[in-house]
Amino acid sequence: MRGYYLRYVQVLLRFFPLAIAFLRDRRRFLLFGPSRHVSTAVHRDRAQQLTETMLDLGPAFIKVGQVLSTRPDIVPPTYVEEFATLQDEVPEEAGGDPMTVVEAELEDVIDLETLEPVAGGSLAFVYTAAYEGERIALKVRRPGIVAVIERDLRVIRGLVPLLLLLADERQRYSIENLAGDFEDIILEELDFARESSIMAEIDDNFADDDRIVVPDTYPDLCSERVVAMEYVEGRKITDERALAAVGIEPTEMATLIARTYLKMGLIDGVFHADPHPGNLSVTDDGRLVIYDYGMSQRLTADEQADITALYRTLVRRDVDGL
């Protein structure tokens, strides 16, 4: 318990100066005087400070930044842009050394000398390795991460009421909904056995669609801490030059992505729930690759029916139906 309170104070002190600045901007209290205009340059500087702070505070806060980078309904565009760097610029030292997990789980079946680091995430690190003559990818959970995440989730839960003081009414609604789901989502994301199972299921669902690539898994190498999968290279989905090089218009790729996610949600009932640019790429032959299934979710038949009804109402412009 003492460790929790120390951590809470540490986090509070890190965010306190920026919190006061935001309150001052909006004149949330009389002692701050009239509200003031804040330039884009100042907002960018603050966004960079917040990004650096989340990196310093560790995996749970990095994950908060990653989620916020996909929520323009909560944070302004300048912050979305800066937080987006957390999608693929997380240093290996952001958590414990993942190599200890690789050595414990796979030393007998993988030649460790063939391991090459590829990318760092808030909860895991990705390597490539040689296995049975193939190049595979290993998503490895950071050691000790579960205890760290559980502690910091308590801290984040305690900070939400303070965060609401900085938000306007529209943002408050979005923040409360996000806070309610965030804890469940991140704890599920730590279960790599669940991820590899859902990944294989989604792969089966697209077996007849050669436009979509879901990397094949290696069940014998997967565990609660490791997801072993086919290594699939791709170009960033946001790189218009890369799309042009393979003969794809951005609108064409956007349509494919939309149709893919509609199929997952409305037809299959199991879907990849983290479609930020760091998790989507395009192959040299123009296929869409989807990575990282930790945030995948399921929809019940009733939920699918409700979403389908909503889309029909929107298409018909039926205001009363909404």
What is each of the regions a protein language model found here?
Residues E134-R142:
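Glycine-rich ATP phosphate-binding loop
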Residues P77, A84-D88, E150-R151, L163-F271, ...:
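ATP-dependent phospho-/nucleotidyl transfer catalytic cores
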Residues G278-V282:
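Hydrophobic residue at the +6 position relative to the catalytic HRD Asp in the kinase catalytic loop
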Residues P143-G158, E189-D191:
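Conserved N-lobe beta3->alphaC-helix segment of eukaryotic protein kinase catalytic domains
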